[in-house]
Amino acid sequence: QYDGVKAPDPGPGPMGMMGARGPPGPPGPPGAQGHTGHPGEPGEPGQTGPLGPRGPPGPPGKSGEDGNNGRPGKPGDRGAPGPQGARGFPGTPGLPGMKGHRGYTGLDGRKGEPGGAGAKGEPGAHGAAGSPGLAGSRGRAGPAGPAGARGADGNAGPAGPAGPLGAAGPPGFPGGPGPKGELGPAGATGPSGAQGSRGEPGPNGAVGPVGPPGNPGNNGLNGAKGAAGTPGVAGAPGFPGPRGGPGPQGPQGAAGQRGLAGDPGTQGVKGDGGPKGEPGNSGPQGPPGPQGEEGKRGPTGELGATGPAGNRGARPGSRGMPGSEGRTGPLGMPGARGASGAAGPRGPPGDAGRAGESGPAGLRGLPGSPGSSGPPGKEGAAGPAGQDGRGGPPGPTGPRGQPGNLGFPGPKGPSGEAGKPGDKGATGPTGLRGAPGPDGNNGATGATGPAGGPGEKGEQGASGAPGFQGLPGPAGGAGEAGKPGDRGLPGDQGVSGPAGAKGERGNPGAAGASGPQGPLGPRGPAGAPGTDGGKGEPGAAGAAGGPGHQGPGGMPGERGAAGPPGGKGEKGEGGHRGPDGNAGRDGSRGMPGPAGPPGPTGANGDKGESGAFGPAGPAGVRGASGERGEVGPAGAPGFAGPPGADGQTGARGERGPSGGKGESGPSGPAGPAGQSGPPGASGPAGPTGARGDNGPPGLTGFPGAAGRVGAAGPAGLVGPPGAAGPAGKDGPRGLRGDPGPSGPSGDQGMVGPPGPSGEKGXPGTPGTSGPLGLQGFVGLPGARGDRGSPGGAGAVGEAGRVGPAGPAGARGAPGNLGLPGMTGPQGEAGREGNPGNDGPPGRPGAPGFKGDRAGPTGAAGRPGNRGESGPGGAAGAVGPAGARGAAGPSGPRGEKGVAGEKGERGMKGLRGHAGLQGMPGPSGPSGDTGSAGPNGPAGPRGPAGPHGPPGKDGRAGGHGTLGSPGARLPGPPGPAGGGYDVSGYDEYRAAKDYEVDATIKSLNTQLENLLTPEGSRKNPARLSHPEWSSGFYVFCDFNTRETCLHAHPGSLARAEGNSRFTFSVLEDGCTRLPLLDLAPLDLGGADQEFGLDLGPVCFK
């Protein structure tokens, strides 16, 4: 029936489905005429116009400012040699030329007259080393070289025997949570145990399942009301009963207090666009708006048509650039050679040179025949080191050894003092040309040269294959708010309106970029020579030229003043060997030399059977020194040492003879590009090319060699988008562009990060009341928590898929000059020069490579005297693995290993002893009145009551569930019932006093807790400060936020012990147990047992 009460408003309904897209509206009315546009971008350079007629030669112009160096012209044909002119004044030094080709050998000139003594010239470059002198006497032993670089790790030796079991380490920190293991299979049923002794009577069993309803009995007589019994001891709380069915719907509750604002929801997915609305009526024309900001630069205009040929020039052009320098004239006739000057007086002896580097290693001897392997000896203790013996006399110089490998770089030596300048020796005869030495090692890295000029633009490389997509980077932090975004995609194209009135003519655009260079016109007549321009900047230093031919000797200058002391001279060549001296007296016995390097490993003998380990013998006597082993192979070349410090400037050497003038060098590199010429006349517009397919973006190629400057290439394909640059400053606002055609709708973007929490919303309408829930347990009141701070921004969603490449954009304005390109690859070798004169003898070449064939074995030499101890040899090759050593001491305890895989299910543990009875729990809240229980046993028959009217037989009700026991307070005394005889019912009377029993049990439990504390708040297992009585103090680790309850080391729980460790907390604030790690240590013995019973607790 209708009760007249208004139903609560459920609020607005859900959003409907999105409608289909409507048809396009009719075209709008034409807009008002726009303002005159800003001048457009400069147009593309027009095509080259036809060649104009040749103008008359102009008068000579004023001398212009110094122009940039022009490109060198092509070399002209070689002219006939002119007569030798008079000697001119010395000109200003010219720019250094490129390295010329080697000239032909000139004829010997006439001998010149001896000149006066010239000034002493600067010291010349170091001359080539002369031929090797005779071997000098053996120098003093140099200091031991630095330790070599660490050798490569040897092969792993065989595994050693297992060490003794180490002592148990301290427990490690809890590890991270392992993955949840799979449920193990059910274990097999264990064997039956032996019959235990009879246990104490157990507590009452749980209520059995409800039996089927009995047949309805006859209605019994109403019994008299019994006397109130004594309140029973509160039973232990029962297990939670099964979940009851839903109760009837309760009355509507009163509106609750307004809750705190919830956390902000995640940002919803962007809804689909609604249907397009119908077009509105045309509004009246508004007043003209203010002048808009300057629009973005429009696209470059199309190429203009070819303009008409220009008029013939009215006045002659300005003076042309000076021509390139003429070719060098032919070489003059060489002069006659001057006489040698007189030898100077002998200078004082120079300082003693540094000790020479160690000589190369001697030849490796032939390997001896392998000896048979002896039985393995016992390892003796090392004997004490003997004293060093005195060095014996030096032996005769051995033959020159084969070249060793490049040694490790030595430490940087101190700068030597400057030596006194030596006298100039007589010029020796020119030696034969030495054979070319092998390639030298790479020199140390030179200082960074000056930055090269900008390279010419290389030709466009082919598109490379597309690169792989990179892995997603880590989520970046929230960026600052960006500047206003770029202009959005153009909207749908409107229907064209009628053409507006013609606008005013725009300002002329800026001059277009210069067109390609026109064909070369006919050569004009030469202008009058201009005045000399100012001296140009000195050019960059050219590469050093090759050595020229030896010119005739100059006139000797006057003797110069003494130069500063020169750098310390190189070690002189050894003198001739002197005659053998008289034999010296025998010296006293020298100290033993240091141990020689290890000898070569002998061939492996037959493997003997392994004998049993014998006892360690006493230390043996030190054996006699073995013969010096062969020098091991040199180690691998070391890394290049650091460049040494600059030495002091040497004295200026004498000026060397002038070289012959070389032939003119190849054309120099192209000079910097000149300034743009005037724009050429526009050429005819070419046909529009077909649109090419977009190529895939290529991988970055290696930088190519600098190509010649090509003609301007066509507009390149759009490259892949570059990395986002920093936000630019806001440009001036452009005029509004025409609406473009509608772009395809993009894919739906990923859900953005949740925004910051919004403002507090208005209270919502009260919802309909839900059905009344089941009554929960009475929880303890929680403390009111602080309001949480808004969560941080979520991680940035993955980037959307890359859209298709757009059409090729208009050609952009020319960019700024790029950074100088990388140094190009080395050019091809020049033409081979003509053979030069025989040069002076070269320095001794680097050691040659090892020959293929071994030479014949020489005759055995006399045994030499014992040499001095040589420097320590290079590290020998890795020897074979040594004999197995004795077991080492136990290593330190390793770090905690990774959690192992889940083990198999263990055997069923022994049954634990019965636990102690718990303390009586606090009184629970009053339970709901239970439904009527089953009929109890018939009570004693009461006196007959008055007869009531007979009722109808009812059906027996179903069995109700037992209610939880409430704390029953005694009611007021009822009226006295009728008396009856209780004899014969003594067996039904309680034989115990329950209150006394409960007190005794409580005391017993407290005594047990004193003896075996279980770790609760009232019975803590161990207090770190027992004198503090205001709380429960445990050992905590605040770094890992752990609560550590350490066991007392003396009371480890055994399987037969009674160990029940529980830990009660004051407040139950969670429903799950976040155990991060559980690592029982020292388990697995036959008498050890481990169990864990976790209740609903929460700690961190």
Curated annotation (Swiss-Prot):
Q: Where is the composition biased (Gly residues)?
A: 268-277, 473-482, 530-557, 656-665, 788-797, 867-876
Q: Where is the composition biased (Basic and acidic residues)?
A: 568-579, 893-907
Q: What is its main location?
A: secreted
Spans of biased composition, class Pro residues? Answer: 239-249
Ranges of biased composition (kind: Low complexity) = 122-170, 200-209, 216-237, 251-261, 333-352, 358-385, 435-448, 460-472, 507-517, 633-646, 666-691, 702-729, 757-775, 798-820, 854-866, 877-892, 916-935
The Fibrillar collagen NC1 domain sits at: 1071-1100
May I have one GO cellular component term? extracellular region
Name the source's superkingdom.
Eukaryota
State a single Gene Ontology molecular function: extracellular matrix structural constituent
Recite the UniProt keywords alphabetically.
Answer: Collagen, Extracellular matrix, Secreted
Which residue stretches belong to region Disordered? 1-982
Q: Which Pfam families match?
A: COLFI, Collagen
Per UniProt, subcellular location reads as: Secreted, Extracellular space, Extracellular matrix
Check the record and name the InterPro entries matching this protein.
Collagen, Collagen_Structural_Proteins, Fib_collagen_C
Family the UniProt entry places it in: Belongs to the fibrillar collagen family.
Q: What is this protein called?
A: Collagen alpha-2(I) chain
What organism is the protein native to? Epinephelus caninus (Dogtooth grouper)
